């Protein structure tokens, strides 16, 4: 890092980034007023595409899923690095995006996460173009779609979908996506998200009494889930986050559903937890059916996986061939086979887990870049970000913070203050040059595949 800092071209670029801070803020504020919920980022993407062209990047284009990419060509055969910020926000299109200012604080939904990062990408590109500095390897700028929620990392999954393409592979990945400027996220929290729907026939709460109740079955399932035991290390968690169902107090619901979130930093633990969830739900359905005089159901699981939206579906509770058993089934003399409850699973999201050691090269390069700018590194460790995808594939990757101060992310009260905001892009410039190498000044710090 010392060699880079002594080079005039690098100092000129660092100076440019500080002087460009006002323009960066202006573009930042313009973008935060453009609606961009996941899967609807097109307007913001077009804004970014034009700015990338103006900044001097080459090969600027919007890919098949809506990612905006542009390349700053390297001088030789160094590692190919991607730096990314996501264009989507968590807010629906109809959200009021009126920008407010009190003192030095700006408020607008999505102003920080992750609009600030996209603005910094554009400033970085301008700095490289204005000063002419180039790494040994190509640096690809990516304003990607669908990082948030049920976007399920769709944009970066698409980028890394074909690992067999040696020419197009990346040797390293840096995501800008945190309010703590000096923060480094280097572990990937994996997640499995399921929409679980319980199906029955439904009926009147009095005259239909005695048929299995989907809401009761879901209640049984939730009770079982709440008793799960998971390890503290590796941290593994579960939550039923949303429940829906029912039409009235005097109605046995025909259908109800719940959204379940499972997380772990360890892929094996996540797989075990997912299996435990499926077993608990199957048991809950069988218990509710048996309570009202229906036999135990054999489970069947049919994996239907859509590679485009990563939605998996499976079913438990085929109603064919039921054998009523002795049970108190209320006023109903003969249980009907088609009254039994069945359940379907839909995988709403899947984010892979992965780990790297804090001492690995890309983490320590980011630490050195922080120190060079006068910041003390905050090792955040594990989170769920776009870096999950490359980390899970064994590609060196981290997520770092953007410049300035912010808070209230994922709320309509989200805010941003441009305090020392240039330090984020300055750190990123040094990090990218250290990773890709700077010919005649410093060799690259990441392994480079042969192309």
Residue ranges of each PLM-predicted region?
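Short coil/turn connectors at secondary-structure junctions
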Residues: 58, 65, 76-81, 95-96, ...
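Metal-dependent amide/peptide-bond hydrolase catalytic core
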Residues: 1-8, 12, 215-451
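Acidic-glycine-rich active-site phosphate/pyrophosphate-binding loop
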Residues: 87-101, 186-197, 368, 398, ...
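Glycine/charged-rich beta-loop-alpha catalytic/anionic-binding loops adjacent to active sites
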Residues: 97-108, 199-203, 371-373, 409-410
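Acidic/His- and Gly-rich active-site-bordering loop/insert found
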Residues: 2-105, 308-309, 314-329
């Amino acid at each position: 890092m010392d060699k880079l800092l002594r080079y005039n071209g690098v100092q000129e670029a660092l100076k440019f980034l500080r002087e460009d801070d006002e323009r960066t803020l202006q573009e930042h504020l313009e973008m935060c007023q453009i609606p961009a919920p996941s899967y609807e980022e097109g307007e913001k993407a077009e804004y970014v595409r034009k700015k990338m062209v103006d900044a001097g990047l080459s090969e600027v284009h919007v890919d098949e899923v809506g990612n905006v990419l542009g390349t700053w060509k390297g001088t030789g055969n160094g590692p190919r690095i991607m730096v990314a910020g996501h264009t989507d926000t968590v807010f629906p299109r109809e959200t009021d995006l009126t920008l407010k200012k009190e003192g030095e604080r700006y408020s607008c939904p999505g102003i920080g996460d992750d609009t600030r990062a996209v603005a910094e990408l554009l400033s970085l590109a301008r700095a490289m173009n204005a000063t002419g500095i180039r790494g040994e390897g190509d640096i690809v700028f990516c304003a990607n779609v669908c990082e948030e929620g049920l976007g399920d990392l769709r944009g970066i999954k698409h980028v890394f979908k074909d690992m067999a393409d040696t020419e197009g592979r990346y040797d390293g990945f840096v995501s800008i996506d945190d309010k703590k400027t000096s923060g480094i996220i280097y572990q990937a929290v994996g997640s499995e998200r399921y929409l679980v729907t319980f199906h029955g026939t439904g009926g009147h709460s009095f005259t239909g009494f005695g048929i299995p109740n989907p809401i009761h079955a879901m209640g049984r399932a939730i009770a079982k889930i709440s008793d799960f035991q998971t390890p503290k290390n590796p941290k593994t968690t579960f939550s039923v986050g949303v429940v829906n169902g029912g039409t009235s107090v005097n109605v046995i619901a025909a259908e109800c559903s719940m959204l379940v979130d499972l997380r772990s930093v360890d892929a094996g633990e996540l797989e075990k937890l997912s299996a435990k969830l499926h077993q608990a739900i199957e048991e809950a359905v069988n218990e509710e059916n048996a309570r009202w005089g229906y036999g135990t159901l054999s489970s069947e699981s049919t994996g239907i996986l859509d590679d485009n939206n990563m939605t998996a579906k499976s079913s438990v509770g085929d109603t064919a061939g039921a054998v009523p058993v002795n049970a108190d089934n209320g006023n109903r003399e003969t249980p009907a086979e088609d009254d039994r409850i069945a359940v379907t699973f839909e995988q709403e999201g899947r984010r892979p887990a992965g780990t790297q050691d804090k001492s690995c090269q890309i983490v320590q390069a980011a630490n050195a870049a922080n120190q060079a700018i006068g910041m003390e590194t905050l090792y955040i460790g594990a989170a769920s970000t776009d870096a999950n995808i490359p980390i899970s594939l064994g590609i060196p990757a981290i997520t770092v913070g953007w410049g300035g101060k912010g808070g209230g992310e994922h709320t309509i009260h989200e805010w941003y203050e441009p305090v020392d905001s240039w330090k984020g892009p300055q750190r990123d410039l040094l990090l990218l040059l250290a990773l890709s190498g700077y010919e005649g000044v410093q060799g690259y710090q990441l392994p480079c595949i042969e192309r």
